[in-house]
Amino acid sequence: MKKQVVEVLVEGGKATPGPPLGPAIGPLGLNVKQVVDKINEATKEFAGMQVPVKIIVDPVTKQFEIEVGVPPTSQLIKKELGLEKGSGEPKHNIVGNLTMEQVIKIAKMKRSQMLALTLKAAAKEVIGTALSMGVTVEGKDPRIVQREIDEGVYDELFEKAEKE
């Protein structure tokens, strides 16, 4: 028998045995508490955000695995800055400022879904999203910070982050 996949959207770190999870996995004969605990462990870093989760179940052995999707980069930036939404006019209206540490943190979360081969490249993708949202980085225009990354200005931060 082939594996069954259940896809749900849960709040990071706060999944409960109630809907939508319980009714979706209960009929498969799984220990719902075990599944909920595993999902909460896997999604705790996305607290306060809706996170897509796939539960892959082998109906014969009752074994399951959890695949956690990552919220969009813009959601992660908004969470990091405590924003409701990005700027409607990013060229004229700046709504927040990210530190390089925050950029690296978001890049590490999103890296598995990005095409970027290095953490630096992933950080530059995050900075590109910040630009379109009206968010500065280190108090500067995001395009300037991208050039500084290429010039090696933040190399120490990246080396430290790669080791963590």
Curated annotation (Swiss-Prot):
- What stretch or stretches form a coiled coil here? none
**Family annotation (InterPro entries):** Ribosomal_uL11, Ribosomal_uL11_C, Ribosomal_uL11_C_sf, Ribosomal_uL11_CS, Ribosomal_uL11_N, Ribosomal_uL11_N_sf
* Swiss-Prot/TrEMBL keywords: Ribonucleoprotein, Ribosomal protein, RNA-binding, rRNA-binding
Q: Name one GO biological process term.
A: translation
Record-level GO cellular component terms: large ribosomal subunit
One of its Pfam families is Ribosomal_L11_N
What start and end residues bound the annotated signal peptide?
A: none
Which molecular-function annotations from GO does this UniProt entry contain? large ribosomal subunit rRNA binding; structural constituent of ribosome
Similarity section: Belongs to the universal ribosomal protein uL11 family.
Q: How does it assemble?
A: Part of the ribosomal stalk of the 50S ribosomal subunit. Interacts with L10 and the large rRNA to form the base of the stalk. L10 forms an elongated spine to which L12 dimers bind in a sequential fashion forming a multimeric L10(L12)X complex.
Q: Which HAMAP family match?
A: Ribosomal_uL11 (MF_00736)
Q: Under what name is this protein listed?
A: Large ribosomal subunit protein uL11
- Species name: Pyrococcus horikoshii (strain ATCC 700860 / DSM 12428 / JCM 9974 / NBRC 100139 / OT-3)
Q: What is the phylogenetic placement of the source species in the record?
A: Archaea, Methanobacteriati, Methanobacteriota, Thermococci, Thermococcales
